Curated annotation (Swiss-Prot):
Biological process per Gene Ontology, one example term: SRP-dependent cotranslational protein targeting to membrane
Written domain comment of the UniProt record: Composed of three domains: the N-terminal N domain, which is responsible for interactions with the ribosome, the central G domain, which binds GTP, and the C-terminal M domain, which binds the RNA and the signal sequence of the RNC.
Function: Involved in targeting and insertion of nascent membrane proteins into the cytoplasmic membrane. Binds to the hydrophobic signal sequence of the ribosome-nascent chain (RNC) as it emerges from the ribosomes. The SRP-RNC complex is then targeted to the cytoplasmic membrane where it interacts with the SRP receptor FtsY.
Subunit annotation: Part of the signal recognition particle protein translocation system, which is composed of SRP and FtsY. Archaeal SRP consists of a 7S RNA molecule of 300 nucleotides and two protein subunits: SRP54 and SRP19.
Keyword annotations of the record: Cytoplasm, GTP-binding, Hydrolase, Nucleotide-binding, Ribonucleoprotein, RNA-binding, Signal recognition particle
Pfam families recorded: SRP54, SRP54_N, SRP_SPB
InterPro entries found in the cross-reference section: AAA+_ATPase (IPR003593), P-loop_NTPase (IPR027417), Signal_recog_part_SRP54_M_sf (IPR036891), Signal_recog_particl_SRP54_hlx (IPR013822), Signal_recog_particle_SRP54_M (IPR004125), SRP/SRP_N (IPR036225), SRP54 (IPR022941), SRP54_GTPase_dom (IPR000897)
Organism in which the protein naturally occurs: Thermococcus gammatolerans (strain DSM 15229 / JCM 11827 / EJ3)
Gene that encodes it: srp54
The protein, known as: Signal recognition particle 54 kDa protein
Sequence similarity: Belongs to the GTP-binding SRP family. SRP54 subfamily.
Disulfide bonds: none
EC nos: 3.6.5.4
Length: 448
């Protein structure tokens, strides 16, 4: 998860409140000190930290909780509200209004810009937009091929010419090419060869003049911490139509510093990079982000992931009928495991469920993910007949499946036991409830 170390430290501070029988001044001061320490270790600017914790302490000591809210709950709410303000208060979504909408992306060398552009293209494609990418990076020889390789599996086209040295010419031609193709969104990638803001902004102005983008997006490396302030400020002052993506938040100890520094400039953060996979780009919503960070969950985010799966996997009425008759086989179970993996890492999903964020040890989550992966390998070694009718799987078949999948007979038996448990559960479910759940969660994919 993005800022996991910071999240665990903040969650630990709030647990002191939960475990205490009374909330007094001494406890509030102790919790505030813990929050200060956690934020400073995440490279948040000391002045910002002191301002934030002063507000938390003053409010916690002076405000009376509303009727029906315990002092403990009220302090947690104050921490949540103040952290949300630190990271920008409200979400600012990316708007696609015109066809085509032209997005120009810029970033300092090593910011992860090319990978982020591929992620953004995939994000928009999943929301129904036809996207075209224009590579104007004439500086780095492999840039065009890297971008092409990242998006080719998703049928997203890249316009570029590794032999052309004129970036502005490439930008103009690429935009015209995709306009003729009738795409919804054109994303223009720039060189990213600059090591400081001044060169970057000069290039941005030149290409902006040539293609007139609807929005300019600055990609900032989250590992630089509070140094992000200067980049974001220079960028904000140079363009009135700018927004920001902060990358590499999954493994950075300084991510909190980067996010808070950018938010302090007033420049809108629209996305954050939370992993290496192409789907690891999230729209940034301070409220939901802080909720997950504190271990309070993100139900809305979980529902959105489920809806994405529903769009990707066509819902069929006969699938529901099959479940209603108890006709659940290993093929259906395989589809469910596939869908779970599409939702993202198990740890990321658990952090969206209130109370589960930091309660499971990392080792338990890792074992769970590994088990799901091995179940799929085992099913890949089964015949079509065995997947359709698991009841025919006897001991000699179990031995063959274990041999073919490089697993043990114990693991194959464990998978079959899990399958039988799920089948039994479906048979015992109330038929009307099952129909309702099937329509809500799409049994062709995620299931329940």
């Amino acid at each position: 998860m993005a800022l996991e170390k910071l999240g665990k430290a903040l969650n630990s501070a709030l647990r002191k409140l939960a475990r205490s029988s009374t909330v007094d001044e001494a406890l509030i001061r102790e919790v505030v000190r813990d929050i200060q320490r956690a934020l400073i270790q995440s490279d948040v600017n000391v002045r910002l930290v002191l301002q934030l914790t002063k507000r938390i302490q003053e409010r916690a000591l002076n405000e009376k909780p509303p009727a029906g809210v315990s002092p403990r709950e009220h302090v947690i709410k104050i921490v949540y509200e103040e952290l949300t303000k630190l990271l920008g208060k409200e979400a600012v979504p990316l708007e696609i209004r015109e066809k085509p909408t032209i997005l120009l992306t810029v970033g300092i060398q090593g910011s992860g810009k090319t990978t982020t552009i591929a992620k953004l293209a995939r994000h928009l494609q999943k929301r129904g937009y036809k996207v075209g990418l224009v590579c104007t990076d004439t500086w780095r020889p492999g840039a065009y091929y890297q971008l092409k390789q990242l998006v080719e599996p998703y049928n997203i086209e890249v316009f570029g010419d590794p032999g052309e040295k004129d970036a502005i010419k490439l930008a103009r031609e690429g935009v015209e090419y995709f306009k003729d193709k009738g795409v919804d969104v054109i994303i223009v990638d720039t060189a990213g060869r600059h090591k400081e803001e001044s060169g970057l902004i000069e290039e941005m102005k030149q290409i902006s003049e040539a293609i007139k983008p609807h929005e300019v997006i600055l990609v900032i490396d989250g590992t630089i911490g509070q140094q992000a302030y200067h980049q974001a400020l220079a960028f904000k002052e140079a363009t009135p139509i700018g927004s920001i993506i902060v990358t590499k938040l999954d493994g950075s100890a300084k991510g909190g510093g980067a996010l808070s520094a950018v938010a302090a400039t007033g420049a809108p953060i629209k996305f954050i990079g939370v992993g290496e996979k192409i789907d690891d780009l999230e729209p940034f919503d301070p409220k939901r982000f802080v909720s997950r960070l504190l271990g309070l969950g993100d139900i809305q985010g979980l529902l959105e992931k489920i809806e994405e799966l529903q769009k990707e996997q066509e819902f069929k009425e006969e699938d529901v009928e099959k479940f209603l008759r108890g006709k659940f086989n290993l093929k259906d179970m395989y589809a469910q495991l596939e869908a779970m993996q599409k939702m993202g890492p198990l740890k990321q999903i658990l952090q969206m469920i209130p109370g589960l964020g930091y309660s499971l040890p990392d080792e338990a989550v890792r074992v769970g993910e590994e088990k799901l992966r091995r179940y799929r390998i085992i099913m890949d070694s089964m015949t079509e007949e065995e997947l359709e009718n698991p009841d025919i799987i006897n001991y000699s078949r179990i031995k063959r499946i274990a041999r073919g999948s490089g697993t043990s007979t114990r693991e194959v038996r464990e998978l079959l036991a899990q399958y039988n448990q799920m089948r039994k559960m479906f048979k015992n479910l109330d038929k009307r409830k099952l129909a309702k759940m099937a329509k809500k969660f799409n049994f062709g994919g995620l299931g329940i």
